């Protein structure tokens, strides 16, 4: 039986220097000797920010066809360098940009929506015995090459895995998913297995582990994902269908604005749902809470500060009035997982008191609890919530596992 193809995506940190590119090439060559492999390359660390800076220096519009051509070049260079490193090891390798790889998109420049994958060229390269090395973060739009938003290489990898019926490996600069960002919370614990739904909640809450749309596509298509470190593959997190475990994680999302407003009773629930869909095209982590009475709708919307004005414009186009409320510099801290057990409100209050936090808004929906606080209170609240909901739990969820 032919082994399933593995789509292995390397993040920018893993490709940050020529020596790391050579190490990645050695890993890929060793893996390709055992199973068919497709590689997805991110831009090297710092390159995308450098390219955006160049666009700003010449006074260019970041959301334009020309800007996307500039920004997409970072991944194209990474893919070509990785292909060259593989060739030096005696392996046939072919670098492909998003168009050549058969990735098709619609929507706006800089945040295009991946709509379809036609991996004919990738299959041809695999059949020839070569290793396809695909530039992530980009796809073909009718009028040119468009980018998929920051973190879009994750989406490239998951979409290719779905189209090729393969497995996805995301090689990151952390060895696994954790119950919190270990850089912010030293007590964070690794997670060995989580469900697609849990990953999607993590990503949407602001965890920098996976592009939110990549998590959604993986869940919809049933793509198994393995998160691992580019230097330490012994520790990993496997993402798949619900496995019966009930982990809890705490996520900080900084630089958030709260928009509040009202809408007339004539506005339908479908319109409110459309607002959420359109806002998530702008900001994948946007959150909307809405309540309705005989006078109409009351809404609260959390978006990034950079997208608040465009969010207000989107709402206006749907007949919904929004405005920035109070302090526009907020952080949201989300507790994700099974938090419905007795006493959760007491643990929440204890964490808020410990952090000396002043919540601006508190929302609970399903398996997620969201607390909005002034930005300076975000990290203390993250640590306090982690202690209450993770560290004081009867048994820690995360343990190391072998590759």
Each PLM stretch: what is its role?
Residues 1-215, 304, 340, 367-377, ...:
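Nucleotide/pyrophosphate-binding catalytic subdomain
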Residues 41-48, 227-239, 295-296:
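Terminal amphipathic helices with adjacent charged low-complexity linkers/tails
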Residues 91, 165-166, 223, 284, ...:
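Short glycine/serine/threonine/alanine-rich loop segments
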């Amino acid at each position: 039986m032919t082994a399933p193809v593995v789509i292995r995506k390397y993040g920018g940190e893993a490709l940050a220097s020529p020596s790391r590119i050579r190490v990645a090439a050695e890993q890929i060559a060793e893996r390709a000797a055992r199973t068919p492999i497709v590689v997805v390359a991110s831009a090297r660390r710092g390159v995308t920010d450098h390219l955006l800076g160049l666009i700003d220096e010449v006074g260019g519009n970041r959301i334009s066809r020309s800007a996307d051509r500039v920004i997409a070049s970072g991944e194209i260079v990474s893919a070509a360098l990785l292909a060259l490193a593989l060739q030096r090891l005696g392996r046939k390798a072919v670098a492909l940009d998003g168009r050549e790889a058969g990735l098709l998109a619609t929507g706006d420049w800089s945040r295009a929506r991946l709509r379809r994958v036609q991996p004919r060229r990738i299959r041809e390269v695999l059949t020839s015995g070569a290793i396809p090395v695909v530039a992530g973060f980009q796809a073909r739009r009718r009028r040119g090459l468009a980018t998929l938003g920051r973190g879009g290489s994750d989406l490239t990898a998951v979409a290719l895995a779905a189209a090729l019926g393969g497995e996805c490996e995301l090689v990151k600069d952390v060895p696994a998913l954790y119950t919190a960002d270990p850089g912010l919370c030293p007590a964070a614990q690794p997670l060995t297995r989580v469900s697609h739904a849990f990953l999607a909640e993590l990503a949407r809450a602001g965890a920098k582990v996976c592009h939110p749309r990549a998590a959604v596509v993986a869940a919809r298509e049933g793509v198994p994902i393995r998160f691992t470190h580019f230097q330490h593959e012994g520790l990993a997190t496997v993402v798949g269908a619900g496995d019966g475990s009930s982990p809890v994680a705490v996520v900080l999302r900084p630089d958030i604005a709260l928009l509040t407003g009202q809408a007339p009773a004539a506005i339908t629930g479908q319109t409110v749902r459309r607002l959420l869909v359109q806002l998530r095209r702008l900001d994948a982590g946007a959150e909307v809470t809405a309540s309705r009475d005989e006078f109409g709708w009351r809404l609260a919307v959390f978006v990034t500060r950079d997208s608040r004005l465009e969010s207000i414009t989107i709402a206006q186009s749907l007949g919904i009035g929004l405005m920035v409320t109070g302090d526009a510099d907020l952080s949201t801290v989300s507790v994700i997982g099974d938090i419905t057990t007795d006493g959760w409100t007491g643990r929440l209050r204890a964490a808020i008191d410990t952090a000396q936090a002043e919540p601006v808004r508190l929302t609970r929906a399903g398996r997620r609890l969201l607390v909005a606080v002034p930005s300076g209170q975000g990290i203390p609240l993250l640590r306090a919530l982690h202690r209450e909901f993770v560290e004081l739990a009867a048994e820690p969820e995360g343990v190391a596992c072998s590759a």
